[in-house]
Amino acid sequence: MIRWDYPPLRSLADIEAIESIPLEQRITRWDFAQNLLDGCRLQPQRAAIHATHLGDIDGPVQTWTFADLERHAIQIANLLRARGIGADDAVAIIGPTVPAMFALLMGSLLAARPFPINWMLDAPALHDLIVQSGAKAVVALGPTPGFEVWEHVQHAVESLQGRVPVLTVHDPFGPAHPNDLLGAASEHPGDRLMFERPTAQRNSVACYVHSGGTTGHPKIVKILHGGLVFRQWAASLGLAFTPHDVVLSDTPLFHIGGLLVRGLVSTADGHTTIIPSMHGARDKTYIANYWRYVERFGITQISGVPTTLSVLAKNPPTTENIASLRPFFATGSTAMAPSIQDRIEEITGARTLQSYGLTENTSHATLDLRDGEIRPGCSGVRVPYVQVRIVRMSDKGDIERDCAVNEVGMVVLRGPGIAGGYLNDDHNQGVFLPDGSLVTGDLGSLDGDGYIRISGRKKDLIIRGGHNIEPRLIEDALLQCPAVALAAAVGKPDAHAGELPVAYVQLHPGASITEQTLLEFAAAHIPERPAVPKDIVFLDRLPLTAVGKPQKHLLQIDAAERVFRQVLQPLTSAWALKVETSGGGLLLTVSVKGGGPQAHRQVDSLLSAFAVRYKVDVS
């Protein structure tokens, strides 16, 4: 499976040359759990994991060898089976990245179906995902200062009346808790599986991962062994991985990118993984020490979503030796200003390879060519054996035609990374097509050389009087301003145009600029006049998912609240407004005290011109 004499990747011609050999001749076994065991056995005494405490580069380090990791994983697999958890049962995993989580993921892949869940969700959201998945066990971070995971998990499972057992993991630099996972697992053999485990097939479900981080409505995706094995192969090819690599795990394991490229793929390829902090890249101490981590541990590839890289670009290494870094690394998740890419290459010598992917494709479908041209604003070319189409779709969701070169349309993928669909079959309609294609919901275009440019989510289009405005057109322009660190554009409701563009920005620390100056900058850099934002809202911190994507549904709610609080000012009775997203759009609830039918009619007269759903509660 693992090879290190990688061919060059300079153009689509090199991709096509790789495809001259059928994938089935390159990959002959599709059992990803077995690949993990093989990775541990490459160099058993090599360090698999180094963990430090909350970004403290000078503090203690917990180290596991690959032999340690394999032993813990097999013990956990035996523990799960001994407690009646079967191959098709889900194990909900709720907590930040610690060494035990790697063993848990690996062990539950051997015995069951791991389901890493966003540990920052509140109790109702956790409960919903646990119930949806049918999890037969929960493993969560126990009581830990600075984290509310345990409290939320307790509330999430209390209505299950003990039907789902809960085990704990702990801060590796703190005490163990009751029902400690590793303690319970230590009572079981670690040198062999105590149950028969058939070899997983290409279409066998390996694990669950939830999507929906930018919408607030997660869907559970069935990730297949075939998709995981292909992702290992494709990532290793695209980034020329070797067992000598040392990588940082600072992206959450509940995100498909953190789970794979900075998680399980690293283990399967025999990399040493550094866990700098349980808070990951959100830990300011870790980010302040970033270049010291590179020096101390000999990091070979930078890790970082664009938001992290923008901070690192402003804080380059000073005396640190970063010669261990290889000449390229990958990032993704959201648009990044070309100036940040240029600055990172200037201070590190490493090129930033942009990628495009999604959970439903088991991570990336495209990646910049490590030996080829990088085109600003693009996310590389398709990886081998993956088909990327840009199509026009009818209002009914049918594919009408393929788009022309540089024409924007819906991105549709097909290939060995496509997931097995959503756990809830009702969500599959119009997304996972009968021919095996995936309708991504993203808009993009392909140039004549196969480079993809992602414009944004179709649902995020700003529709101004029939004019479709791509948010990225606004965001890319604002990111060219030296004062702007992050930007996100959404539509605000308008009685005449339907929507008008508004931008939310986060400035670099210490930067200053007025709204008027930034509006003028936007007008000068946005080629379409209707796309120039009407307002710019400055935020101390843009709301982001754990991997740096703007949570646009929150910004859409904020923009609507700002509009309708002004629109409803003429109401003569006391009133309150609630705005939420529902059914793919906005839903307003206006609560009025007193006034009877007259108050209801007054609300109708104020809101009827807007293309939003609303309800009126009169008390």
Give the label of every model feature segment.
Residues A140-H152, P276-G280, Y290, F297-D342, ...:
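Adenylate-forming
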Residues P44-A47, F173-A176, S186-H210, H217, ...:
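Conserved pre-ATP/AMP-binding loop-to-beta segment of ANL
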Residues T28, Q45-V98, F102, D122-H127, ...:
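Conserved AMP-binding/adenylate-forming core of the ANL superfamily
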Residues L121-V131, V138-L141, I302, G415, ...:
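AMP-binding/adenylate-forming catalytic core of the ANL superfamily
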